[in-house]
């Protein structure tokens, strides 16, 4: 969106045909979403009598949430006990025990005894700087740090893009192209001099580690633009300022030095048992100092990762003795899996729920960076998922939907395979025709195999039973069921035009409305007795029998019959 970038783009225009495959893939994605959605939503809504929104990506995402909820509910927490000895300046832990008595026995044998260092192992380790943000990783970080939803982050980033302060939002790349190195270097140097959290950086920025044109498809990573150097950030809305500052901090982290530390593991013998003490000594803060200062600036404490870090150990050597030691039992319980947050769910969507994918492996995910936020919002909007603070919890309706859906609709891995094939269409490794034939075949098979609701699932949607309409009567024209609607009583037969309107000219002239009871009597007996009918001619009311006089035309007619023994009211 910067003027210089636009001029640069026009100076290096590429033939439109180079993007034909990208267009084909986008068309396939839209077509597949429509074809699966319109068929599966109508199919399962009709089968179970309640609106059930089904989507090619939405349903597998919901299935991830339902599976996690089942794991949490089915988890049985068990206690554990860890014997520990306290030496001068540090604590060492023994092997975890299932029984408290066993841990207490170990502690009794160690209390007041001598602990001797058997081995000391030291390793120098490094944590490489993080990669730049793509949309999904930025959404995850904003949810983790600020609590923003994925849609809020996208909206803030889109606003920054339109103000020329950030690059294109909807990207799945975490790298820049080689021709951006000069611009990126100038930007990093400006950020180092003007952002408080950047002033700690002293080494030459390593722009090379964030540039790799082969890993950039249609758009590069999200970074600030040069416009940030001419903008007073204090005038930005809070959400936009938060996102832009975070993007700037990530650019500084990604181009800074590695974080290096020495990890120490010491094994001690005491009372015939082994105990282990672990510690960590920072040798070079590197990029983590930028992160620390950034969080300090936003008045945020330590991250969960920092809370779990081992403290530094005193200098230890083999055969070193500590006497006397005190021993105690640390009690704990096993924890269930955590509920998904938007941060962790977006991560799961990237890999279709497969954890621990190695760097560089093809990620067969659910949806695209541009669509994931909207999918999460729709799951909440249709009542399948609810937000409880940062947690995403499937509702009973959402859980029941996943229960009735077949695997080929709700399986994250199968859906991810389709997404992978779309990537192949983009690269010219698969044809759009083959992809759409597969989607059409799956949709056809889905409808053919699910013609009736499964008996075991019929009670899952009680709102369908409570909301199910009862027939008012039988249609005199076609024999179909006549159902009550908002404005009248209508035959369910699609080709039959029979209708009794609640407010029609006949009853309006007599200042009456056609009630459900009256309509039922007309359909069953062809007649209904009514009192208090108004006469336009005399201005008086009277009683009469209303007769159904249907000749098969567009409108149903009525006529009156007067009982011989009843007089008219005055």
Residue ranges and their predicted role:
Residues 17-31, 133, 217-219, 433-449, ...:
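A broadly tuned preference for mixed-charge, low-complexity surface segments
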Residues 372-439:
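Internal insertion modules embedded within essential enzymes
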Residues 197-218, 410-451:
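Leucine-rich, amphipathic alpha-helical/linker segments
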Residues 377, 403, 420, 424, ...:
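Amphipathic alpha-helical coiled-coil/heptad-repeat segments
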Residues 1-350, 357-366, 370-384, 389-391, ...:
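Toprim catalytic domain recognition across nucleic-acid enzymes
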Residues 47-50, 448-570:
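Functional cation/ligand-contacting sites centered on basic and imidazole/sulfhydryl donors
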Residues 9, 141, 156, 348, ...:
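Generic alpha-helical secondary-structure signal
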């Amino acid at each position: 969106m910067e003027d210089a970038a636009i001029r640069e783009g026009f100076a290096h225009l590429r033939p439109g045909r180079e993007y034909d495959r990208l267009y084909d893939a986008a068309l396939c994605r839209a077509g597949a979403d429509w074809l699966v959605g319109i068929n599966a939503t109508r199919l399962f809504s009709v089968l179970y009598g309640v609106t059930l929104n089904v989507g090619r990506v939405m349903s597998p995402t919901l299935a991830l949430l339902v599976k996690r909820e089942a794991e949490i509910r089915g988890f049985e927490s068990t206690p554990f006990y860890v014997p520990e000895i306290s030496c001068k300046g540090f604590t060492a832990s023994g092997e975890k025990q299932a029984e408290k008595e066993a841990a207490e026995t170990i502690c009794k044998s160690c209390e007041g005894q001598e602990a001797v260092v058997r081995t000391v192992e030291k390793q120098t380790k490094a944590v490489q700087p993080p990669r730049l943000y793509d949309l999904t990783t930025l959404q995850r970080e904003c949810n983790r740090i600020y609590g923003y939803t994925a849609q809020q982050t996208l909206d803030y980033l889109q606003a920054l893009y339109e103000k020329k302060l950030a690059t294109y939002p909807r990207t799945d790349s975490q790298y820049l192209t080689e021709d951006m190195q000069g611009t990126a270097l100038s930007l990093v140097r400006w950020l180092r001099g003007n952002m408080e959290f950047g002033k700690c950086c002293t080494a030459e920025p390593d722009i090379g580690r964030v540039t790799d044109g082969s890993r950039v498809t249609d758009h590069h990573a999200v970074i600030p633009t040069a416009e940030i150097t001419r903008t007073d950030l204090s005038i930005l809305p809070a959400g936009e300022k938060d996102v832009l500052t975070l993007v700037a901090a990530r650019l500084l982290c990604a181009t800074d030095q590695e974080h290096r530390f020495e990890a120490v593991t010491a094994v001690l013998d005491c009372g015939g048992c082994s105990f282990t003490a672990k510690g960590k000594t920072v040798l070079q803060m590197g990029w983590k100092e930028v992160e620390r200062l950034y969080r300090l600036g936003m008045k945020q404490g330590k991250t969960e990762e920092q809370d779990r870090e081992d403290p530094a150990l005193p200098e230890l050597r083999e055969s070193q003795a500590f006497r006397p030691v005190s021993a105690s039992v640390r009690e704990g319980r096993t924890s269930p899996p955590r509920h998904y947050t938007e941060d962790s769910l977006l991560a799961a969507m990237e890999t279709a729920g497969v954890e621990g994918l190695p760097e560089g492996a093809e990620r067969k995910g659910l949806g695209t960076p541009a669509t994931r936020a909207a999918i999460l919002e729709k799951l909440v909007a249709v009542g399948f998922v609810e937000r409880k603070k940062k947690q995403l919890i499937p509702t009973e309706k959402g859980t029941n939907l996943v229960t009735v859906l077949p695997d080929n609709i709700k399986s994250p891995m199968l859906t991810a395979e389709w997404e992978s094939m779309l990537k192949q269409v983009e690269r010219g490794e698969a044809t759009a025709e083959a992809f759409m034939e597969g989607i059409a075949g799956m949709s056809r098979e889905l409808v053919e195999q699910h013609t009736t609701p499964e008996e075991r699932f019929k009670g899952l949607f009680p709102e369908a039973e409570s909301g199910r309409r009862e027939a008012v009567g039988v249609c005199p024209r076609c024999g179909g069921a006549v159902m009550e609607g908002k404005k009248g009583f209508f035959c369910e037969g699609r080709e039959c035009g029979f209708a009794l309107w609640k407010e029609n000219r006949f009853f309006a002239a007599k200042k009456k409305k056609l009630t459900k009871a009256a309509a039922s009597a007309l359909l069953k007996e062809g007649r209904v007795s009514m009192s208090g009918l108004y006469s336009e001619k005399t201005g008086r009311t009277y009683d009469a029998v209303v007769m159904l006089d249907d000749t098969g035309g567009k409108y149903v007619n009525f006529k009156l019959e007067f009982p011989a023994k009843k007089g008219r009211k005055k």
